[in-house]
């Protein structure tokens, strides 16, 4: 299985990768995108099983990438790991088809709890 990690912070992508490994998902193919547009393009080209996205990124936000993917008929499991969390953001994410919304800081246990049902 393939997991796409989209975040404009290289350090945060590394932290998400490390936490995925700690949660037992290290055997998955982990690929990275540095902004929302790249996440959109890579999702269409690489066909990941899961997209873990930051909310605020240059070029295109994570929410804009999700909306654009859904409009194009792509139903990849997509959700957010972000430091910002408001009820409005969560409602927008759910309305766009987000599978999860994880608030930073996060733990390997939280990743396991959220991603095990998604990845099987």
Enumerate the language-model features and the residues they cover.
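A Lys-centered signature of the CheY-like receiver
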Residues: 8, 104
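Active-site residues of response regulator receiver
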Residues: 54, 82
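Two-component/phosphorelay signaling modules centered on CheY-like receiver
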Residues: 10-31
């Amino acid at each position: 299985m393939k997991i796409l990690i989209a975040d404009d912070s290289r350090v945060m992508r590394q932290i998400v990768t490390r936490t995925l490994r700690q949660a037992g998902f290290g055997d998955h193919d982990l690929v990275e995108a540095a902004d929302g547009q790249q996440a959109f393009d890579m999702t269409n080209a690489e066909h990941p099983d899961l997209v873990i996205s930051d909310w605020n990124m240059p070029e295109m936000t994570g929410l804009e990438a999700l909306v654009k993917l859904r409009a194009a008929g792509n139903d990849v499991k997509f959700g957010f790991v972000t430091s910002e969390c408001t009820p409005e953001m969560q409602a927008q994410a759910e309305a766009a088809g987000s599978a999860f919304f994880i608030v930073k800081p996060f733990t390997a246990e939280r990743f396991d709890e959220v991603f095990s049902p998604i990845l099987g």
